UniProtKB/Swiss-Prot annotation:
Phosphorylated to form H2AXS139ph (gamma-H2AX) in response to DNA double strand breaks (DSBs) generated by exogenous genotoxic agents and by stalled replication forks, and may also occur during meiotic recombination events. Phosphorylation can extend up to several thousand nucleosomes from the actual site of the DSB and may mark the surrounding chromatin for recruitment of proteins required for DNA damage signaling and repair. Widespread phosphorylation may also serve to amplify the damage signal or aid repair of persistent lesions. It comes from Oryza sativa subsp. japonica. This is Probable histone H2AXb. The lineage of its organism: Eukaryota, Viridiplantae, Streptophyta, Embryophyta, Tracheophyta. GO terms for molecular function: DNA binding; protein heterodimerization activity; structural constituent of chromatin. Variant histone H2A which replaces conventional H2A in a subset of nucleosomes. Nucleosomes wrap and compact DNA into chromatin, limiting DNA accessibility to the cellular machineries which require DNA as a template. Histones thereby play a central role in transcription regulation, DNA repair, DNA replication and chromosomal stability. DNA accessibility is regulated via a complex set of post-translational modifications of histones, also called histone code, and nucleosome remodeling.
Length: 138
């Protein structure tokens, strides 16, 4: 009367495959690894079951957001490969990401192109005759 393999008992049957917590949550980021890091980091005495899943989801969302914007920046520059410069442009041109990563320095990222308003040429309606005659009057 014992169940040999797939019967009505509790627990796993012998033929069942283990399913990762990442796949259960529908995530690409590793839930188990993040749980291990949370436990080893001594951030708290105990770590709840949902905490690493939630943190994995947040990290995956942020990574996807940055990669999407960096891919757009690479495409705008007619490149197929994302380099640190594209990540820098993506982060600094997005208001929320720029605020979140304000104190972060991206290696080989460069700076945003910016020319101060006072250094730009004036858009006045003067023609060339007016410019030359004004400097000659004493």
């Amino acid at each position: 009367m014992s169940s040999a393999g797939g019967g009505g008992g509790r627990g796993k049957s012998k033929g069942s495959k283990s399913v990762s917590r990442s796949s259960k949550a529908g995530l690409q980021f590793p839930v188990g690894r993040i749980a291990r890091y949370l436990k080893a980091g001594k951030y708290a005495e105990r770590v709840g079951a949902g905490a690493p899943v939630y943190l994995s989801a947040v990290l995956e969302y942020l990574a996807a957001e940055v990669l999407e914007l960096a891919g757009n920046a690479a495409r705008d520059n007619k490149k197929n490969r994302i380099v640190p410069r594209h990540i820098q442009l993506a982060v600094r041109n997005d208001e929320e990401l720029s605020r979140l990563l304000g104190a972060v320095t991206i290696a080989a990222g460069g700076v945003l192109p910016n020319i101060h308003q006072t250094l730009l040429p004036k858009k006045g309606g003067k023609d060339k005759a007016d410019i030359g005659s004004a400097s000659q009057e004493f």
